[in-house]
Amino acid sequence: AWSQIVDAAVESGLVVTLSAGNEFGSATGAGCNTIDSPGDSRLPITVASLDKDLSLAIYSSRGYTSDGRVKPDVAAIGSNIMAPNQGTGTGYTSKSGTSMATPLMAGIVALTLEANPDLTPAEVKDTLVAGYSIEREILNDDPDAASNNCSILETRPDNEYGYGQADPLVFVEIAGKIDPDVSVNWT
């Protein structure tokens, strides 16, 4: 139900960013295929969490969705983020999670739309295809890939990083150059 509501919001013209969830390293032993609603929605941008060294955070949920689609769409730093301390109302505290990575992606989307306010939600999402910046050898050089048995794809997007790390500068540069006649189909 939530996924349908979020997809409807995107269809109405809103660019929506969603957290992938924090189920990979949970106490339940969850692993791959841990992205649930609403992170499994078709149309919004689903965000995984990176550690400061740009490796995927152990807690960040991985795809595939229950119907076999690749998610997340992109990854952003979400570990050890300084945030207001809600408990005391004063000061700051360190927080980690995909819910800390998602606001970073929302900010990147805002900068992208500032550079090109005429972009549709689909065109903003298309910038993911051209704007990813993590280059890595999947399976061959990633010792964690074999141990987590997530069937990581050797192409982008994959079910851990999506299209890779969100790079604000690249997204804004691409937004200014997007040809509205070119699009990528999301299935």
Each language-model region and where it sits:
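Generic recognition of stable, solvent-exposed alpha-helical segments in well-folded globular domains
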Residues: Q4, L54, M100-P103, G107, ...
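Catalytic metal-binding/acid-base residues of hydrolase active sites
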Residues: V15, G21-G25, K52, N80
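Residue-level detector of functionally special positions within alpha-helical transmembrane segments
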Residues: G21, G97-S99, G162, D167
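Extracellular S/T/G-rich loop segment that most often corresponds to the catalytic His/Ser-adjacent loop
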Residues: D36-E114
